[in-house]
């Protein structure tokens, strides 16, 4: 893709939301430039929503541009209020450092850190934690208008709510703007890439660079990963869909993509895979069985990309086993009897095995005839293991048509 119009490609595939000057951004990306994208270490793994961004970075790098990945060890101590209705939980230093290391390891699977336009990964704690507060206020505080900051959507929404906006969070925009300025000065970065909810923060950095160094820098934002109805992608009843196999197993990951809405398949193939446009169009031009095949291609491409061919093969075999009710090959959930706290109800077992987020949801699943143990449909919310004529230490638990696990209880 080198020397091609990568910006037009990204627009066509559905990545781009907004840009501060598309004509100049296009010229910069065609000739090859340095850009940065930031990730705050609020968890020890990326989730599906992050993967859209990682794919955009991957395309930009393949087109000859240099990615600078900023892990927010410093900004993560404050928390971004964008898209939040309440203050984020403040993480301690040890947790932030651990999360940063996990993210570094995970990103290296998708972005090249070798070669002519290799990616560089930096931690903004390396410069933010060294800042003298008084000196920062004197040199950079004068560059920011409180009026303009309060007009930003992220601040405006919080400011009008009862929970309000903490002074800690109010500083986030200044810190992110300073990141852009620092990277512009030290890494020659002149484009910041971010989600559509980061527009105000990125523009603050563009303005700071112009004020302090009279250089031109640019903002480029991406669409958030959403379903066709506009709701956020990457969440299930039991939580987020993580890229770390210890948080979301390859089997669960594979199943998640098999079960997406038909209307989302083509868009996700365009955004999350490297398949060419014609292949994707051919896969999605017909409905019915054809769209089911397209979902299998999507699930296979993403599972292989994230977890590798071996884990994909296992996920496919487990899916076949579940469909054929061959429990020997199902994913196994092993627990101790003590994990159940003397509550052997099916409702509680659903929660402990993470098939349900709560007993209330378990009861709802049972009353809607979505739960079975081995071949027995569970219809009473009070049903316990002892009520069933089964081996109470080794059985198959089913939720709906797609979620099946083998449960082993060690006494």
Swiss-Prot record:
It comes from the Bacteria. A motif ('HIGH' region) lies at residues 41-50. GO terms for molecular function: ATP binding; RNA binding; tyrosine-tRNA ligase activity. It catalyses: tRNA(Tyr) + L-tyrosine + ATP = L-tyrosyl-tRNA(Tyr) + AMP + diphosphate + H(+). GO terms for biological process: tyrosyl-tRNA aminoacylation. InterPro entries: aa-tRNA-synth_I_CS (IPR001412), aa-tRNA-synth_Ic (IPR002305), Rossmann-like_a/b/a_fold (IPR014729), S4_RNA-bd_sf (IPR036986), SYY-like_C (IPR054608), Tyr-tRNA-ligase (IPR002307), Tyr-tRNA-ligase_bac-type (IPR024088), Tyr-tRNA-ligase_bac_1 (IPR024107). Residues 344-409 form the S4 RNA-binding domain. Pfam families: SYY_C-terminal (PF22421), tRNA-synt_1b (PF00579). A motif ('KMSKS' region) lies at residues 232-236. Its EC number is 6.1.1.1. L-tyrosine binds at residues 36, 172, 176. Keywords: Aminoacyl-tRNA synthetase, ATP-binding, Cytoplasm, Ligase, Nucleotide-binding, Protein biosynthesis, RNA-binding. PROSITE patterns: AA_TRNA_LIGASE_I (PS00178), S4 (PS50889). ATP binds at residue 235. It is an enzyme of class 6 (ligase). SUPFAM superfamilies: Alpha-L RNA-binding motif (SSF55174), Nucleotidylyl transferase (SSF52374). One of its GO terms (cellular component) is cytosol. It is found in: Cytoplasm. Belongs to the class-I aminoacyl-tRNA synthetase family. TyrS type 1 subfamily. PANTHER family: TYROSINE--TRNA LIGASE, MITOCHONDRIAL, TYROSYL-TRNA SYNTHETASE. Homodimer. Catalyzes the attachment of tyrosine to tRNA(Tyr) in a two-step reaction: tyrosine is first activated by ATP to form Tyr-AMP and then transferred to the acceptor end of tRNA(Tyr). This is Tyrosine--tRNA ligase.
């Amino acid at each position: 893709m080198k020397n091609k119009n990568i910006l037009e490609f990204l627009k066509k595939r559905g990545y781009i939301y907004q840009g501060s000057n598309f004509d100049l951004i296009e010229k910069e990306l065609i000739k090859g430039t340095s850009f940065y994208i930031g990730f705050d270490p609020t968890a020890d793994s990326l989730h599906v929503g992050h993967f859209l961004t990682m794919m955009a970075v991957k395309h930009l790098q393949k087109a000859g541009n240099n990615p600078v990945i900023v892990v927010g060890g410093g900004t993560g101590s404050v928390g971004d209020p964008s898209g939040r209705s309440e203050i984020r939980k403040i993480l301690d230093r040890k947790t932030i450092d651990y999360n940063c290391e996990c993210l570094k390891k995970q990103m290296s699977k998708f972005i090249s850190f070798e070669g002519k336009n290799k990616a560089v990964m930096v931690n903004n704690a390396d410069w933010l934690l060294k800042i003298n507060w008084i000196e920062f206020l004197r040199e950079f505080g004068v560059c920011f208008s409180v009026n303009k900051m309060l007009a930003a959507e992220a601040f405006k929404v919080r400011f009008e709510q009862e929970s309000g906006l903490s002074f800690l969070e109010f500083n986030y925009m200044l810190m992110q703007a300073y990141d852009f300025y620092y990277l512009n000065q030290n890494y020659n970065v002149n484009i910041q890439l971010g989600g559509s909810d980061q527009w105000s923060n990125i523009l603050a950095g563009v303005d700071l660079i112009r004020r302090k160094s009279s250089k031109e820098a640019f903002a480029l934002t991406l669409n958030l990963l959403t379903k066709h109805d506009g709701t956020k992608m990457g969440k299930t009843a039991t939580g987020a869909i993580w890229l770390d196999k210890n948080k979301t197993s390859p089997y669960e990951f594979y199943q998640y993509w098999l079960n997406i809405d038909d209307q989302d398949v083509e868009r996700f193939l365009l955004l999350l895979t490297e398949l060419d446009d014609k292949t994707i169009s051919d896969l999605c031009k017909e409905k019915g069985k054809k769209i089911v095949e397209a979902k299998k291609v999507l699930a296979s491409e993403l599972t292989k990309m994230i977890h590798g061919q071996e884990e994909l093969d296992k996920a496919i075999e487990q899916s076949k086993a579940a469909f054929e009710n061959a429990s020997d090959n199902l994913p196994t959930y092993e627990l101790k009897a003590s994990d159940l706290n003397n509550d052997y109800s099916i409702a509680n077992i659903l929660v402990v095995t993470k098939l349900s987020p709560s007993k209330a949801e378990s009861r709802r699943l049972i009353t809607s005839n979505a739960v079975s143990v081995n071949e027995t449909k569970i219809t009473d919310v009070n049903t316990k293991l002892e009520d069933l004529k089964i081996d109470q230490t080794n059985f198959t638990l089913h939720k709906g048509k797609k979620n099946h696990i083998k449960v082993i209880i060690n006494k």
